[in-house]
């Protein structure tokens, strides 16, 4: 299995609130980056290695909006150009570190790790529910010791809820329900409806109405690592499958995974809802509950990665339930192939 990831893509690097006027290091797609918020509020993202001796700039300090290397005091501005060298007046014109394109959107800081000429802000994944006033919610970041694509696999096939999350969001109906898969050049959608079923514990608590429900899970994948899941329940027979969700409760599970290395990733997630939006305690309770659910996934995924590390020649076998994940993998492979040449592109087709 390839451990490649596309570089010509926007990746979430941090929650916006985590980037302050201080040096914040993070490894993304195998590249060491240091971020900080400038005095004008804009975020700068630089290669975390001094031009002089490669010491991480994150070991230094900020002087205004200038990064000062902690080893020999070279200074770099927010664009990565050296503005000071000790004991000399002339600054070598090649003295600069790479600056990465940055977009702040949907409560995340997004970095473009590839060719900066291709960094179109319009390509930032759509996660607008995360800062839409009609929706309320919150989330967290998980450092998962697995290939980011394993998290994508996990989210594209929610059959596992029956077996991993039976005490909260899963029950037998999830594993047995039929589903549809559609796909585009950089997107995959998996749609699953479960009609006239018993609500699992989490959704029963949210709906607060007795009786059978119609439940939906509509998974939207945006390459290379964003998965937004439209979820909810409504009393059975009240029109939800036909488009009227007014009698139910609706949420979105927003997920975006950023490769750190070939076998580790940063997993940013949030759960947002369009009901009881002013209840901060509910926001906190759901966030902590979902964090517990995702910890169950983390245990499984890290165990899976360890098994893969120990058995590098073993391959995956696919079931019908893997259709969404398989298409997501194909989309990612094609993105990588476009960056690495025609031979790789042919292999991805």
Where are these regions (language model features)?
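Rieske [2Fe-2S] iron-sulfur-binding domain
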Residues: 2-136, 188, 252, 349
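C-terminal catalytic domain of Rieske-type non-heme iron oxygenases
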Residues: 42, 121-349
